[in-house]
Regions:
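Non-catalytic, solvent-exposed segments at the cell envelope interface
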Residues: 2-324
């Protein structure tokens, strides 16, 4: 890790994104959307499994001498935890849009700027998503970096250095130690990953009361309803100079509208009722998510799917970890 990266641990300087708070808000919303993607994606797995199982069972034929059959796959027993992190990294397809952040000495650094602990309870199933501030000063345990070298434990460092020191596993170890919760599953996503998922479902609809013309992001949109994806989606999420009084409040309003629209579309019949779209979404998720080995097991995915398939969207609650 470079000295520059260490110096910027608590500040993500994203080009024209001049406020670190705005970047943190953006990444948090992106990670929250990915929590929805994971839950919805698991729902997709449940849909395929149950549809396949019901179809095969309806046409099955009993054979003599086969009383002892393998047990059915059941839902994951008990509650479980999943860590989801949004990482701030300079991806080749998007780095040209982030100015100094991705052209200077900080370009090689990767920080876990968004950190979520997703808890799925025992029956009755409920989902609680706890958000941890990136600059939360806490102990960081000793971890192994990508070269297999052990990093020294630190008594008080911002949470967002954990990924740099030891990747996804170090983030999990840090959050597990902080909360005294065992974590069974984990995944990370980049900014570009969320954009690719938006593309996979054909974009999301946003409605503008007034036109937006922002020379900083290059966004030029008329008033009314638009379906945004790709670069335009990225511009829409970043713009603030062309919205309202140019403050971060306008940007946050855009982001909330975008993420709400994304979440609604993910759980709508337009996605969950469309097999080709679901397959494309699943494939895009595989390509854009870094997961723990426990999430690489198809049977485990089915078990998780069966555990959460009936949780209504209103029973997914988001809270922030308290800071002193």
């Amino acid at each position: 890790m470079s000295d520059n990266t260490r110096r910027r641990r608590t500040v993500a300087r994203h080009g024209q994104l001049r406020s670190p708070g705005a970047v943190s808000q953006l990444l948090r919303l992106l990670a929250i959307s990915m929590a929805v993607v994971l839950v919805s994606g698991i729902g997709v797995a449940a849909y395929f499994y149950l549809d396949f199982s019901n179809t095969v069972s309806a046409n099955a034929v009993d054979l003599d001498g086969q009383e002892d059959l393998p047990p059915d796959i059941g839902a994951y027993k008990g509650g479980f935890n999943l860590v989801l992190t949004g990482v701030d990294t300079c991806e080749d397809d998007y780095k040209q849009y982030f100015g100094d952040r991705c052209t200077g000495g900080d370009a090689e650094g990767t920080l876990n700027d968004v950190n979520l602990l997703v808890h799925v309870s025992e029956e009755p199933r409920r989902i609680t998503v706890v958000s941890f501030p990136r600059d939360l000063m806490i102990p960081i345990p000793s971890c192994e970096d990508e070269d297999g070298n052990a990093t020294a434990a630190m008594s008080k460092q911002p949470l967002n250095v954990a990924y740099t020191d030891g990747g996804l596993n170090c983030v999990v170890r840090t959050i597990s130690s902080l909360t005294d919760q065992e974590v069974q599953f984990a995944a990370s996503v980049t900014f570009g990953g969320v954009i690719e998922i938006t593309n996979a479902i054909g974009g999301v609809d946003v409605c503008l009361a007034n036109p937006i013309r922002d020379r900083y992001t290059g966004l030029d949109m008329s008033a009314g309803t638009h379906t945004v994806k790709g670069l335009e989606a990225l511009q829409f999420l970043r713009t603030r100079h062309g919205v309202g009084d140019g403050s971060d409040l306008g940007r946050i309003g855009n982001q909330q509208q975008y993420m709400s629209s994304l979440a609604r579309k993910l759980i709508s019949g337009e996605v969950l009722g469309n097999v080709p779209v679901m397959l494309k979404l699943a494939n895009t998720g595989i390509q854009n998510l870094e997961t723990s080995t426990s999430l690489a097991d198809p049977m485990m995915i089915v078990q998780i799917a069966l555990a959460v398939k009936s949780v209504p969207f209103e029973d997914i609650v988001f809270v922030q970890y308290p800071t002193l």
